[in-house]
């Protein structure tokens, strides 16, 4: 196999670089001189022919590409730096690579900027243009800030002179889009409305009227009581005179009868009714005492049963019908809410005979009254009475429990 030394390779590379620089600068190109390369037969094998690329290959390929592009596309437009629009529209995603041919001004709003021709000696041959893609594959014109120029293909070229005749508007700094400041709505801090109430009116007048009415009632009661006492005294005196008539002997002259105003019987009836209503049922529980007027409807010496788990449809009649087969049955009542009138789910049944009480506890416990089975137990209504509570407290004190 033919092998080259490092010096020969370096010489070939320098020669190729010199020819390439001459082609780029546009100078005359010397005919290519192919030096004879000594071939050293290291082994008795067939020599390997290595193709050598000539220096004019680049120019020939470039000319063929230019001729082909001229038949497909017209003369290339002069490169114009795209002007920056006053108000940039929303950004569009830019493809990874867009040729310079496709970077044309959109909408015809950009004016082509002319620049002076560079010196003939420094111009570089135009690069071959690729054939344009079909219309279906054409990318939409990209609107946005100007892209930096693409790097040249191939070895680096010499320094280029500054381009003259450029429009200063095209190369000016991009104008910042002035946005109208957002309208700031002022925050209003509002205090809570103050309510002015009228000063409380003194109730001295009402209190005075109430006191006067109370005094009138008390005076009327006192007058009634005095009249009743006088009537009772007259009756007693009449009885004494009757007993004196039975005595034998001289009798004293009878005194003249004293005319007393007749007393209304209605006042006496009211007094008796008030004396009967003096009886109160005071209950005590959790350190609180109150008067329970509902206990006055029941007899104090009866045998009472507590009936629990009653349905909403059970009333006094249904409960009385369930226990009316016992001969000593007295009363049945379902406890209801005073405000709404709904049942509280329990009630009471009373008997006069203790035997009927025991039979009802044994037979009716768990029976259906309405839509639910009834639950019975002994009523402990006496344990909450004030007298019983005080008696129990005294007994506990004697025993030393409290």
Swiss-Prot record:
InterPro entries in the cross-refs: Nucleotide-bd_a/b_plait_sf, RBD_domain_sf, RBM42_RBP45_47-like, RBM42_RRM, RRM_dom
Entries under PROSITE patterns matching the protein: RRM
Annotated compartments: Nucleus; Cytoplasm
GO molecular function: mRNA binding
Recorded GO CC terms: cytoplasm; nucleus
CDD domains to which the protein is assigned, alphabetical: RRM_RBM42
Translocase listed as a keyword: no
Compositional bias segments (type: Basic and acidic residues): 256-275
Keyword field contains RNA-binding: yes
Any one Gene Ontology BP term: lens development in camera-type eye
Domain RRM stretches: 303-381
Cysteine pairs bridged by disulfides in the record: none
Region of interest (Disordered), residue spans: 240-275
Keywords: Cytoplasm, Nucleus, RNA-binding
Family note: Belongs to the RRM RBM42 family.
Function: May bind RNA.
Protein name: RNA-binding protein 42
Organism from which the protein derives: Danio rerio (Zebrafish)
Gene of this entry: rbm42
């Amino acid at each position: 196999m033919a092998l080259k030394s490092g010096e020969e390779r370096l010489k070939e590379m320098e020669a190729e670089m010199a020819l390439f620089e001459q082609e780029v600068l546009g100078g005359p190109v010397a005919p290519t001189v192919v030096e004879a390369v000594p071939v050293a037969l290291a082994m008795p094998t067939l020599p390997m022919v290595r193709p050598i690329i000539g220096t004019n290959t680049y120019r020939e390929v470039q000319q063929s590409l230019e001729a082909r592009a001229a038949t497909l596309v017209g003369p290339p437009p002069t490169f114009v730096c795209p002007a920056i629009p006053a108000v940039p529209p929303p950004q569009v995603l830019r493809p990874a690579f867009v040729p310079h041919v496709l970077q044309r001004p959109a909408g015809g709003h950009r004016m082509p900027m002319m620049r002076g021709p560079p010196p003939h000696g420094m111009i570089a041959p135009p690069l071959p243009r690729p054939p344009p893609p079909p219309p279906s594959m054409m990318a939409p014109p990209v609107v946005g800030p100007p892209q930096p120029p693409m790097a040249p293909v191939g070895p680096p070229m010499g320094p280029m002179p500054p381009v003259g005749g450029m429009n200063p508007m095209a190369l000016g700094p991009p104008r910042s889009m002035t946005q109208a400041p957002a309208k700031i709505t002022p925050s209003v801090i509002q205090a809570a409305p103050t309510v002015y109430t009228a000063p409380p009116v003194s109730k001295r007048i009402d209190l005075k009227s109430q006191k006067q009415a109370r005094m009138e009632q008390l005076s009327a009661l006192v007058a009634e009581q005095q009249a009743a006492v006088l009537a009772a005294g007259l009756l007693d005196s009449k009885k004494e005179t009757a007993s004196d008539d039975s005595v034998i002997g001289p009798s004293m002259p009878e005194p003249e009868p004293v005319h007393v105003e007749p007393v209304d019987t209605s006042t006496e009836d009211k007094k008796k009714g008030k004396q009967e209503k003096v009886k109160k049922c005071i209950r005590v529980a959790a350190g609180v005492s109150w008067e329970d007027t509902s206990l006055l409807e029941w007899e104090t010496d009866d045998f009472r049963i507590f009936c629990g788990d009653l349905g909403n449809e059970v009333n006094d009649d249904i409960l009385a019908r369930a226990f009316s087969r016992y001969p000593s049955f007295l009363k049945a009542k379902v406890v209801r809410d005073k405000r709404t009138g709904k049942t509280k789910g329990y009630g009471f049944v009373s008997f006069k005979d203790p035997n009927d009480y025991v039979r009802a506890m044994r037979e009716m416990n768990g029976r259906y009254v309405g839509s639910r089975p009834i639950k019975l137990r002994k009523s402990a209504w006496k344990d909450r009475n004030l007298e019983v509570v005080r008696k129990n407290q005294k007994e506990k004190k004697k025993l030393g429990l409290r």
